[in-house]
Regions:
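N-terminal Rossmann NAD(P)H-binding glycine-rich loop of SDR-like oxidoreductase domains
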Residues: 3-23
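NAD(P)H-binding glycine-rich loop region in Rossmannoid oxidoreductase-like domains
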Residues: 35, 41-92
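Conserved Rossmann-fold NAD(P)-dependent oxidoreductase catalytic core, especially the SDR/UDP-sugar
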Residues: 91-135
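Active-site Tyr-X1-5-Lys
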Residues: 133-158
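Glycine/proline-rich active-site loop of Rossmann-fold NAD(P)-dependent oxidoreductases
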Residues: 142, 154-156, 167-176, 211-221, ...
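NAD(P)-dependent short-chain dehydrogenase/reductase
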Residues: 152, 159, 164-195
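Alpha-helical substrate-binding/gating segment
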Residues: 178-186, 194-228
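Mid/C-terminal beta-alpha module of Rossmann-like enzyme folds, strongest
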Residues: 211-261, 294-303
Length: 303
């Protein structure tokens, strides 16, 4: 199977490349600079340009493009950059893949975020059928996903991964969260009762490969633990795993003052479930918060 990656140098893209290379699969990547090897192809998504040769023989394209939501503050120009970087990469990838039709079955695995649903206001979980919220990040994910439509219209099988924070020591959220805990300064965020979506890197990589090889998989999938986990439960699991106490708490007011809107993503209650993955028979290797923390500390990149 031949794969094309956009965003291959980031945390998740690097993990995908390592996994696929270990299996002997063929991987080519899109770069914004002059290509340095025969496995690199240039593109400029902000200008809507892409080297169409990148799609030659490709079975699966994975689009992870987009600048990080951090750093703060979310100024108007930063908001525009966060949105444009996602919509432009997705639109350029989707239109290029659509224009390169060669009669073969092809798949686009498109990144998105669990932030589409906003915070939880009731006891019912968010599923893939739940409507998008109205806040800034929810609007970003809605436009992000819509930008992949040209590929679907051209007959490409499009799988949208609404991903929660992917936990692993090699990068992302967990790499930042574990540092204060290792120093004995870990803390519960807010009152700790808020549900906190997450998935291990090991399971994230498994979902990507499942999406690539499951011919009837299409549309959105929530990537989060099948068992809801609170921030306090995550703190307990991490404290136990690194043999450190949990006695500190960061009040919600301090977080809101320091982080502004982003604080809502950390102290807001988010209850989403991977309904479609479970219904389609996907089996999580790390279904509980204790499993996720253990896997993250071992670092799935080495697996």
């Amino acid at each position: 199977m031949k794969w094309l990656l956009a965003g291959a140098s980031g945390f998740l893209g690097t993990a995908i490349r390592i996994r696929l290379a270990s299996e002997g699969q063929q991987v080519v990547r899109l770069v914004r600079r002059e290509p340095a090897t025969s496995t690199e192809f240039s593109w400029d998504p902000d200008a809507g340009r892409i080297d169409m040769a990148a799609f030659d023989g490709v079975d699966v394209a994975v689009n992870l493009g987009g600048v990080p939501v951090a750093p703060l503050p979310w100024t108007e120009s930063r908001r525009e950059q966060i949105l444009a970087s996602r919509v432009n990469t997705t639109s350029t990838m989707a239109r290029g893949f659509a224009a390169h039709a060669d009669g073969r079955p092809r798949t686009l695995i498109q990144a998105s975020g669990i932030a589409r649903y906003g915070t939880t206001s009731g006891s019912e979980p968010y599923t893939e059928e739940s409507p998008a919220a109205g806040d800034y990040l929810a609007q970003v994910t809605t436009k992000w996903e819509a930008a992949a439509q040209p590929a679907a219209d051209a007959g490409v099988r499009v799988v949208i991964l609404r991903t929660s924070p992917v936990m692993d020591s090699s990068g992302g959220t967990f790499a930042l969260l574990k540092l204060p805990w290792l120093c004995g300064l870990g803390a519960t965020l807010g009152d700790g009762s808020q549900r906190m979506p997450m998935i291990s890197l090991r399971d994230y990589l498994a979902v990507v490969q499942w999406a690539a090889t499951t011919e009837d998989a299409s549309g959105p999938y929530n990537l989060t633990l099948p068992q809801p986990t609170t921030n306090a439960e995550f703190a307990d699991a991490l404290a136990a795993a690194v043999h450190r106490p949990r006695f500190l708490r960061v009040p919600a007011g301090i977080m809101q003052t320091a982080l502004g809107e982003l604080a809502g993503q950390l102290i807001g209650d988010m209850y989403a479930v991977p309904q479609r993955l479970v219904a389609n028979g996907f089996v999580f290797s790390d279904p509980t918060v204790e499993d996720v923390v253990g896997s993250a500390l071992r670092s799935a990149v080495r697996h």
